[in-house]
Amino acid sequence: MLDVLGKDLKVLFVGINPSLRSAAVGHNFARPGNRFYPALYAAGFTPRLFKPEEDRDLPNYGVGITNFAARPTRAADELSRAELVAGARVLDTLVTNLEPRLVAVLGLGAYKLALGRPKAAMGLQPETIGGRPVWILPNPSGLNAHYKPADFARLYGEVRTYAEGL
């Protein structure tokens, strides 16, 4: 429902699932306090700070968005493991067809559950999705207080630099 896709993507960002706010307005990362768009801008993916309602323009900058699960929830922990695993299978096919340079998963816990990789850590993964490299980033939700804006800027910047080198 909220996929933002295109050809020649540098990075396909994979969220866990839409928030209730995102589902209501029809745009990704729309919940107030979400740090996705500030992180994209700070990392140099976009030339200015985008608003959620501009998400459909992101493929013009090599950025795509999808989610493991399409079902909106108040919190990601309301999803079942089965929903995440099913979403990972769909994601594999999507990535195979789109061939983005890099897949960036937004959330370590969701990645571990969806892909059955309990020992995964942040950063570049030894496994691929759809034959493409995978990088795990912290989830930009405002509920994730472990990371500050400067952390997101640095980590998303590492992803941009890596993807541009592929």
Give residue ranges: language-model regions.
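Short histidine/acidic/glycine/proline-rich micro-motifs that form metal-
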Residues: 27, 110, 141-144
